[in-house]
Amino acid sequence: MQVASVLSRGLPYIQRFTGKTVVIKYGGNAMENEDLKSSFARDVVLMKLVGINPIVVHGGGPQIGELLERLNIQSRFVNGMRVTDAETMDVVEMVLGGQVNKEIVSLINAHGGTAVGLTGKDANLIRARKLEVVNRSPELERPEIIDIGHVGEVASVNVDVIDMLTRSNVIPVIAPIGVGPDGASYNINADLVAGKVAEAMKAEKLILLTNVSGLKSKEDKVLTGLTAQQVNDLIEDGTIHGGMLPKIRCALSAVENGVRTSHIIDGRVAHACLLEIFTDEGVGTLISRN
């Protein structure tokens, strides 16, 4: 009876979201715990089975760091971003485009899905431009541009490739590597790639899996539903700060550029994606334009 009740409660959501696109940024604990990996793969397969088009964009920072350490390649960070020279970029491509991407693809396929792994270099899926980091320290006479190597931002997304895959019942799994005008590879923040893919696809939802239970008030209570304006107010008054800011800016940009809702959800919870999409309660914070 309990199973029947769960399925019955999910039916209106299945009907509402059939045929819609959901972009999921997969990272954090959900990528490290074996049980959470399996629950995520099952969630994605089930979404596809009920007619939703999931698109997975994944990170892999810890795995990159581990291999660089094993290879005795020193990592340096500027404003939280890994300085990526040519040697480091080779490692990034091996880890993201090879190890991590293929593990996710295999896991989804093992649970009955049909996943295909891509990097942004495949069919020019993600065109990139070099990211400029500017040091505006008051000690400097003028702003200083810091070269952080092969770190980029999204210039454009080839939606035709993704459309072709989703129409053929395939689940795209995208590694956040872009290609520059000269053919060079660029390492791009996975949240940013997920957000730009969601915007380009006019997705119904952008879901960012995190290691937190959602956005919290100053009283440490999870804020389950916010408008873009309310989020901007929370940034302004310092409630949202630090490492969460880049994720929130991606989520805000998405809802301001055609995505219906963005979700900051707790990837430490089993079946977090299904709970967020198919239940009233959810497992995080929903952000809408208004």
Curated annotation (Swiss-Prot):
GO terms for molecular function: acetylglutamate kinase activity; ATP binding. Substrate binds at residues 60-61, 82, 187. GO terms for biological process: arginine biosynthetic process via ornithine; L-arginine biosynthetic process. Its EC number is 2.7.2.8. Its main location: cytoplasm. The keyword ATP-binding applies. It catalyses: N-acetyl-L-glutamate + ATP = N-acetyl-L-glutamyl 5-phosphate + ADP. CDD domains: AAK_NAGK-C. Keywords: Amino-acid biosynthesis, Arginine biosynthesis, ATP-binding, Cytoplasm, Kinase, Nucleotide-binding, Transferase. Pathway: Amino-acid biosynthesis; L-arginine biosynthesis; N(2)-acetyl-L-ornithine from L-glutamate: step 2/4. Gene3D superfamilies: Acetylglutamate kinase-like. GO terms for cellular component: cytoplasm. The record marks 25, 247 as: Transition state stabilizer. It is found in: Cytoplasm. Catalyzes the ATP-dependent phosphorylation of N-acetyl-L-glutamate. PANTHER family: N-ACETYLGLUTAMATE SYNTHASE, N-ACETYLGLUTAMATE SYNTHASE, MITOCHONDRIAL. NCBIfam families: argB. Belongs to the acetylglutamate kinase family. ArgB subfamily. This is Acetylglutamate kinase. The gene is argB.
